[in-house]
Amino acid sequence: METFLFTSESVNEGHPDKLCDQISDAVLDACLTQDPDSKVACETCTKTNMVMVFGEITTKADVDYEQIVRKTCREIGFISDDVGLDADHCKVLVNIEQQSPDIAQGVHGHFTKRPEEIGAGDQGHMFGYATDETPELMPLTHVLATKLGAKLTEVRKNGTCPWLRPDGKTQVTIEYRNEGGAMVPERVHTVLISTQHDETVTNDQIAADLKEHVIKPVIPEKYLDENTIFHLNPSGRFVIGGPHGDAGLTGRKIIIDTYGGWGAHGGGAFSGKDPTKVDRSGAYIVRQAAKSIVAAGLARRCLVQVSYAIGVRGALSIFVDSYGTGSIPDKEILEIIKEHFDFRPGMITINLDLKRGGNGRFQKTAAYGHFGRDDPDFTWETVKPLKWEKAQA
């Protein structure tokens, strides 16, 4: 039986790039909560003792950007210089301007266009992917790497492993079998965890705690065997972390945000962008389309691409690839998708309820992945019934 290895990585919420994603989306949440029509393009960068938010925001909301930055950093666990950043004493720089009037008139006509008339906020192409290898219809490598990162944060915050600090990275390699284009996981080949820690803990204690409290609860026993390789803090020391260890920037973890290297990616980041930015809303609708196709049994794997032009209200192109796993031809799957999903940016916003802020909705997406999450705020994860196709299949 021929097999192959595939690897996905993740970083947890204390990684400096992910810190920036969460701040950018916390700003978006604050704007949308007060003004659902806010136009937001918020970037964040960070380095030792400094966080800067910058970009273009047009909103009626009264937003205290500095307070949002400090609160987000504090909630993640950056409460002293020792752990990489002191939320209450770091410098916070703000350079926010309004959206370009040229973009505003082309996209939403300075708020005069009806939803079905709203154009895309930029050009670009986005991909959605789904696979039947997990209940989430997501790649197992990505699911496990992401859950390991989330578990690291959980055992840090609940005191199970008090030596943990906020920054951390995970990576999982799985041995797969290709079953007619579908991906079948056979075993976990390698688990890699590099986590920030305090000065008191030994490498032996780190390895023992990670195996017992992080790996064991996350990775199903059936995938582990005597040949599984574990690299647990292989560099030997990871005390300096967070923005003290590395600079951070919004939008640098786009593969972690999506499918862990599976499928494809158009290159656009998500965080800090309101739904007129098709980098985000377009990627959400094609995930829903791909997931709905796999959930309906029309394919075991599915990739959907959509493309846009700035100011143009409809999609330029839609593409489908079932990797040979379709129960009907790809051209028929494409027609089903066109029949059931509205790719106009204004209608995506309405159908997925993307103007709704509150409940830390978009900040939640900014750590541990935008897809495969069981949360009612992740409206794009709702499988859409494909009634017409069931009569045809």
UniProtKB/Swiss-Prot annotation:
Residues binding ATP, per UniProt: 15, 167-169, 235-238, 246, 252-253, 269, 273, 277
One Pfam family matching this protein: S-AdoMet_synt_M
Cofactor(s), by name: Mn(2+); Mg(2+); Co(2+); K(+)
Cited InterPro entries: ADOMET_SYNTHASE_CS, S-AdoMet_synt_C, S-AdoMet_synt_central, S-AdoMet_synt_N, S-AdoMet_synthetase, S-AdoMet_synthetase_sfam
Annotated tissue distribution: Roots and shoots.
Gene3D superfamilies (UniProt xref): 3.30.300.10
Binding positions for K(+) per the UniProt entry: 43
Family: Belongs to the AdoMet synthase family.
Protein name according to UniProt: S-adenosylmethionine synthase 2
Organism of derivation: Pinus contorta
Taxonomic path: Eukaryota, Viridiplantae, Streptophyta, Embryophyta, Tracheophyta
Gene responsible for this protein: SAMS2
